[in-house]
């Protein structure tokens, strides 16, 4: 019976980590400039799986003139000390709404909005440590810009709030040295911009909240012309602590197009979506993505991976209405069929958290490549302020086959079978793999406790241990083979 309180304690500790297959969270921000600041809405880009470039704005952006910029050269295992990016040229200290991308040479492109007075494009050849070229994109009235970088081409869309109102587009075909701009839509609202693998541009719009509509348009000639708008749904949205806009996202792969936004018609926030299976020609009815409708769900973001798997993340809190004591977490769902159905949601954030400020950013994003799904967000686990955090998961571990043909998960045995509670004799089973296998045990601080296996596994192999070989507590088993990876949480009772 004495073990029961300890077991409950350890189970509670185990709950304070991201659900596998997502890796333990890595802090991205470090209060650039030496100030205690609250990181807000963020964007990031991934280059060749190794280089990650991140930017965000601040809750204090009206008084602290900078965009915290961070980068990783090891796939997000760690991030270098942040650079407090600041440009006095626009003459406006309000640095906000940044977006970032990487071109075909690995050079970094970033756009920054200065209040609503102007928008500038920045170009770096050394991963953002210095910025070599600055280009004025547009002037007064700019709000909520989004950017797509493809090879030497850059596409930017934003809401124009003064002058010729509407959704505007800027396009560059020379790496951002010059831009052509023009109005492409007379409607206003929050827009979402995406590009599929065939270089079709997809544009979503939520207008006139608290009560408005959701629209879609498409360009098949790289922004020269745009299709007639399609009305997808009406919308309903009310602001609250932690969220203040029905931010939408759009992603496309093959003939599948998926658009999300935040809706509060049920009395609380939900992440809702419409989907198309014919390239945006026709659309489904609106449906709810989150599988827990209690409390509030907001800041949804969707991303198709290169194999057509669909990934969606959002902020979740069980509390309603939201306030400074609300406990938030980052949730995630995977769909193998373009959003027709979803697996149960997982938690990406290691812990729940409250936000010390109302502004948690209006958007945070997912990115993917041929191996991983990547996530970045801001949270208040530090208690005094909000910081950016990062996590990733192997596509093969969230139900994605490494190729164009889908393979249901049960066909390929898991590489590691292991009990999650160790008390006495322990048997770990390793399944055969073509690539060498490594298995190691780590403590909660990420320190390697012991290597348990290293080498080829031709037939099912057992690794036998006793729980008495290790101290009481929480551990992680890390199994790797080639590009595959599995992480399991272990609670150990020495016997």
Region annotations inferred by a language model:
Residues 10-11, 134, 455:
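Short, linear, compositionally biased motifs with a strong N-terminal bias
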Residues 18-398:
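Extracellular, repeat-based ectodomains that mediate carbohydrate processing or recognition
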Residues 406-495:
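C-terminal outer-membrane/trafficking sorting elements
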Residues 1-4:
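Positively charged n-region of N-terminal signal peptides that target proteins for export
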Residues 394-410:
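Low-complexity, Pro/Thr/Ser/Gly/Ala-rich linker/spacer regions in secreted
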Residues 8-9, 223-224, 494:
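A periodicity- and composition-biased signal for non-globular, repetitive helical segments
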Residues 9-18:
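Hydrophobic h-region of N-terminal signal peptides that target proteins for export
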């Amino acid at each position: 019976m004495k073990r029961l309180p300890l077991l409950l304690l350890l189970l509670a500790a185990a709950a304070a980590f991201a659900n596998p297959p997502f890796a333990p969270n890595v802090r991205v921000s470090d209060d650039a400039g030496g100030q205690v600041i609250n990181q807000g809405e963020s964007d990031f880009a991934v280059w060749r799986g190794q280089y990650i470039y991140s930017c965000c704005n601040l809750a204090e952006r009206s008084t602290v003139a900078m965009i915290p910029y961070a980068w990783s050269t090891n796939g997000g295992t760690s991030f270098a000390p942040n650079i407090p990016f600041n440009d006095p040229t626009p003459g406006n200290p309000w640095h906000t709404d940044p977006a970032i991308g990487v071109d075909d040479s690995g050079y970094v492109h970033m756009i920054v909005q200065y209040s609503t007075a102007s928008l500038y494009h920045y170009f770096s050849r050394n991963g953002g440590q210095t910025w070599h070229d600055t280009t004025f994109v547009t002037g007064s009235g700019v709000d909520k810009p989004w950017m797509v970088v493809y090879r030497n081409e850059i596409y930017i869309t934003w809401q124009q709030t003064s002058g010729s109102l509407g959704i505007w587009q800027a396009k560059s075909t020379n790496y951002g040295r010059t831009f052509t701009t023009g109005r492409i839509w007379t409607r206003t609202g929050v827009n979402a911009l995406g590009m599929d693998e065939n270089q079709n541009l997809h544009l979503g719009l939520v207008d006139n909240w608290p009560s408005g509509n959701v629209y879609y348009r498409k360009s098949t000639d790289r922004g020269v012309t745009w299709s007639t708008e399609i009305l997808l749904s009406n919308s309903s949205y009310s602001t609250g602590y932690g969220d203040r806009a029905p931010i939408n996202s759009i992603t496309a792969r093959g003939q599948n197009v998926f658009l999300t936004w935040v809706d509060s018609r049920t009395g609380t926030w939900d992440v809702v979506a419409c989907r198309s299976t014919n390239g945006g020609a026709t659309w489904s009815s609106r449906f709810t993505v989150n599988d827990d409708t209690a409390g509030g769900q907001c800041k949804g973001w969707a991303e198709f991976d290169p194999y057509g798997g669909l990934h969606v993340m959002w902020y979740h809190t069980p509390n309603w209405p939201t306030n400074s004591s609300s406990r938030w977490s980052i949730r995630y769902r995977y769909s193998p069929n373009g959003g027709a159905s979803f697996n149960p949601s997982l938690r990406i954030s290691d812990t729940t958290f409250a936000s010390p400020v109302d502004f948690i950013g209006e958007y945070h994003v997912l990115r993917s490549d041929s191996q991983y799904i990547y996530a970045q967000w801001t949270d208040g686990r530090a208690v005094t302020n909000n910081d950016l955090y990062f996590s990733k998961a192997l596509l093969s571990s969230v139900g994605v086959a490494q190729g164009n043909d889908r393979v249901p998960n049960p066909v390929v045995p898991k590489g590691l079978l292991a009990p999650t509670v160790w008390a006495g004799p322990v048997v770990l089973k390793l399944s055969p793999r073509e690539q060498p296998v490594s298995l190691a045990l780590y403590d909660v601080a990420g320190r390697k406790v012991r290597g348990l296996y290293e080498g080829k596994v031709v037939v099912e192999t057992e690794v036998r241990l006793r729980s008495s070989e290790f101290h009481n507590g929480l551990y992680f088993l890390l199994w790797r083979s080639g590009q595959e990876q599995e992480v399991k949480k272990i609670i150990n009772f020495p016997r």
